[in-house]
Swiss-Prot record:
The gene is pyrG. Pathway: Pyrimidine metabolism; CTP biosynthesis via de novo pathway; CTP from UDP: step 2/2. Homotetramer. Its EC number is 6.3.4.2. Pfam families: CTP_synth_N, GATase. ATP binds at residues 13-18, 70, 237-239. This is CTP synthase. The keyword DNA damage does not apply. The keyword Membrane does not apply. CTP binds at residues 12, 145-147, 185-190, 221. It comes from Methanococcus maripaludis (strain DSM 14266 / JCM 13030 / NBRC 101832 / S2 / LL). One of its GO terms (molecular function) is CTP synthase activity. Residues 1-264 are annotated as: Amidoligase domain. It is an enzyme of class 6 (ligase).
Length: 533
């Protein structure tokens, strides 16, 4: 078992996640079994209760983990399924250690950061790496952050625990480009490596993020001052698409270098399919715009997996998918139709997607967007809350009901959306929703079954509310097709409309299972329908 630790320096949001994911892809392309771990130094147990404005998307795993969005990149790049345990947080570590202390597991010893916290960190990493050839562990944050210190100490000890031949340290750092001087500056990276060495970690490989190519002179300088071999100074310049990064890093020799340093048999990586995907992304034949009607559009990372799923579907259809970010609150006015008409007339809206979310802010704008898509025959995909908004819209404007969700109005006359029965008595917020993968049975000859190519589907979920079963019949009687149900026949999983270009919604989050090489069928269908005139 081999372990690769990826740290970051100078600034955050540098691309450690994409670098780690890209390396995972290169190693998997060499036939190695790869696992991925993200360490987040915040005190939450998981990402489930964090604001999308602060942390971006909550990525849900099959086993119901509410995790950091980087796990989504790992799954997409490496094409693997991860679990809740693949996201380690400070909160999880301290919770576990303190629980053991209360049970008396430490036999009266003084519980300290070293060795108890660091041992807990190491044990989790080792347990997760048991079934893999290589485990890549990304350390969140930046070297120098006080929150990261216990994790950095733990990974420092790792080399001694498992043998230096089984451990590799990769440091991702920024080379700022001073445009007025036309120069890349190495000093911030030198200081970052110095700080890392002060903790006791000597990087084996330096991955340098930059806007422009790195000269041989700069590589020589970094090799000298950071005490790494010149061939271990890897250029990682800005790419045209994140999916081009593995190809750029392979060209720089990162995959070969890693296998050599870990004494693994190197082989020519099979990146044929990956190159074809990147080529289709970079050289599209068509171009469309999908409007995402959201509540958290100020931070685009809130919809990371949706953006990527649209990109995957676009590549499959040789189409560039532009995104028009539409603030749902702006569609709550009476002139919402005028706003959307102008976008359609200007060729800036070919399809509409209403994503998930929580709370009543901007809900009527989402409902109006659904109504516009339904009445104007605009391709539409609703996800989670988006499906609930589609049901509310249909109940109001087709069934003639004064309908709403009890999430937004507890006294609504017609609660077409209501709590899942099991959720009624739940009081705690964290980790208590209907989470993870659940199966659905699709109606034969429905749009859903046609898209999936089967009457069985499994998707990941994150919700407390459902389409109220008491209203299923009146909705169906008025033309709404409930085309997917939970196996027990109680919970509506998919809805759709007949005689519409493309109108489908799901209670699930299909975006989490889309891959560059396997676009999700619901997104593929949306893009395909939006291309057609």
């Amino acid at each position: 078992m081999k372990y690769i630790f990826v740290t970051g320096g100078v600034v955050s949001s540098l691309g450690k996640g994409i670098t780690s994911s890209s390396l995972g892809r290169l190693l998997k392309a060499r036939g190695l079994n790869v696992n991925m771990i993200k360490i987040d130094p915040y005190l939450q147990i998981d990402a489930g209760t964090m604001s999308p404005f602060e942390h971006g998307e909550v990525f849900v795993t099959d086993d119901g983990g509410e995790t950091d969005l980087d796990l989504g990149n790992y799954e997409r790049f490496v094409d693997i399924g991860l679990k809740a345990d693949n996201n380690i947080t400070t909160g999880k570590i301290y919770w576990s250690v303190l629980s053991k202390e209360r049970k008396g597991d430490y036999l009266g010893k003084t519980v300290q950061v070293i060795p108890h916290i660091t041992n807990e960190i190491k044990d989790r990493i080792k347990n997760l790496g048991k079934e893999s050839d290589i485990t890549i562990i990304e350390i969140g944050g930046t070297v120098g952050d006080i929150e990261s210190l216990p994790f950095l100490e733990a990974i420092r000890q790792f080399k001694k625990d498992v043998g230096k031949e089984n451990v590799l340290y990769i440091h991702v750092s920024l080379l700022p480009y001073i445009r007025s001087a036309g120069e890349l500056k190495t000093k911030p990276t030198q200081h970052s490596v110095k700080e890392l060495k002060g903790i006791g970690i000597q990087p084996d490989i330096l991955v340098c993020r930059s806007e422009i190519p790195i000269s041989e002179k700069i590589k020589d300088k970094l090799a000298l001052f950071c005490d790494v071999e010149k061939e271990a100074v890897i250029e990682c310049k800005d790419a045209r698409t994140i999916y081009e990064v593995p190809l750029n890093l392979e060209k720089e020799g990162l995959g070969k270098l890693v296998t050599e340093k870990l004494n693994l048999r190197d082989s020519t990586p099979d990146l044929t399919e990956w190159r074809a995907i990147v080529d289709r992304i970079i050289n599209p034949m068509n171009e469309i715009t999908i409007g995402i009607v959201g509540k958290y559009i100020e931070l685009k990372d809130s919809y990371m997996s949706i953006m990527e799923a649209l990109g995957h579907a676009g590549a499959k259809n040789d189409t560039k998918v532009n995104i028009a970010w539409i603030n749902s609150e702006e569609l709550e006015t009476k002139n919402y139709e005028e706003i959307l008409n102008k976008m359609v007339d200007d060729e800036k809206l070919h399809g509409i997607l209403v994503p998930g979310g929580f709370g009543d802010r901007g809900i009527d704008g989402k409902v109006n967007a659904v109504r516009y898509a339904r009445e104007k025959n605009i391709p539409f995909l609703g996800i989670c809350l988006g499906m609930q908004c589609a049901v509310i819209e249909f109940a109001r404007h087709v069934c003639g009901l004064n309908a709403n969700s009890t999430e937004f109005d507890e006294e609504t006359e017609h609660p077409v959306i209501d709590y899942i029965p099991e959720q009624r008595e739940v009081t705690e917020k964290g980790g208590t929703m209907r989470l993870g993968a659940y199966p659905a049975v699709l109606t034969e000859n429905s749009l859903a079954s046609e898209l999936y190519g089967s009457i069985n589907a499994s998707e990941r979920h994150r919700h407390r509310y459902e389409v109220n079963p008491e209203y299923h019949e009146i909705l169906k009687k008025n033309g709404l097709i409930i085309s997917g149900m939970s196996p027990d026949g109680k919970l509506a999983e998919f809805i759709e409309l007949e005689n519409h270009k493309y109108f489908i919604a799901t209670q699930a989050h299909p975006e989490f299972k889309s891959r560059p090489n396997k676009p999700h069928p619901l997104f593929h269908g949306l893009v395909k329908a939006s291309i057609e005139k």
